[in-house]
Every structure is written in C-alpha cells, then in structure tokens.
C-alpha cells in the first residue's frame, strides 16, 4: 500500500506501507486551527477527531 503521510499544509509526501491494507486521513481542530494528519493503517481515534480510511494507493490525499 502507498499512502500520503504529510500533515496539514505540508507539501505532499508518500510512504510505502508493507503489509498494510488501508490509508487514513484524520482531521481535528485545536488552538492552531484545523489539523490534518495522513498515514498508513486505520487507527482508532478519540471523540471529536474525524477519520477517513480507504483501501487504494494514495487514496488519503
């Protein structure tokens, strides 16, 4: 699986994730504004954090 792994407004970067079948994009707000985190897998999240998990290469743009 190949997933995007940059945070928020950083330039796009990708990561190869051997053995993974998902990519994710998490979104939440704090004192800095809206934070977006991307990576491999499909982690569980705390209340108030949005999560999008997908199953194709680079699907978490």
Swiss-Prot record:
GO cellular component: extracellular region
SS bond list: 3-23, 17-40, 42-53, 54-59
Protein's cellular compartments: Secreted
Protein name: Short neurotoxin 2
Molecular-function annotations in GO: acetylcholine receptor inhibitor activity; ion channel regulator activity; toxin activity
Free-text tissue specificity from the UniProt record: Expressed by the venom gland.
Annotated signal peptide: none
Pfam families with a match to the protein in the record: Toxin_cobra-type
Organism superkingdom: Eukaryota
Keyword Chloroplast tagged: no
Keywords on record: Acetylcholine receptor inhibiting toxin, Disulfide bond, Ion channel impairing toxin, Neurotoxin, Postsynaptic neurotoxin, Secreted, Toxin
SUPFAM superfamilies named among the record's database cross-references: Snake toxin-like
Record's function text: Binds to muscle nicotinic acetylcholine receptor (nAChR) and inhibit acetylcholine from binding to the receptor, thereby impairing neuromuscular transmission.
UniProt entry tagged with the keyword rRNA-binding: no
Family recorded in the similarity comment: Belongs to the three-finger toxin family. Short-chain subfamily. Type I alpha-neurotoxin sub-subfamily.
